[in-house]
Amino acid sequence: ALASKATGYPLAFVAAKLGLGYGLFDLKNSVTKTTSAFFEPALDYVVCKIPRWDLGKFHGVDRELGSSMKSVGEVMAIGRTFEEAIQKGLRMIGQGMHGFVGNKELVIEDIDKSLREPTDKRIFVISEAFRAGYTIDQIRELTKIDKWFLDKLMNIYQTSKELNKW
């Protein structure tokens, strides 16, 4: 469902028709109604799907995330870059945060421990770790999060630092 929503390409419809024996050239593009469905969607945007956690409403619930589903919903954020999309998504998840950076009400007693534990707040802990001087490699070692994502989050943090100079 996310791929169809994000691309505008009717994957389920096309897959069903292919299963019935139609070819891609037989199917019409649902948008143009003239060209065939044999095309690759050209996207100039990035989509981030972020689970919405509401663990504070449930008493006694462990905040650590694992294989069991604890999300109460999700947001789908769209932007020209990953940085823009993740910022939009983090603002929409309803945790009272201002995005990746600028969350002064977040209290972290032990950054290393908070980075190691996969919780609903860990992405915001990463921002605090950057502020405390942690490097991308240090955070990667503690979280096991791919460096590509940490580089993008560092871009947001650096941009915030630049804007705060003004």
List where the protein language model places each region.
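ATP-dependent carboxylate activation and anion-phosphoryl transfer catalytic cores
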Residues: 1-166
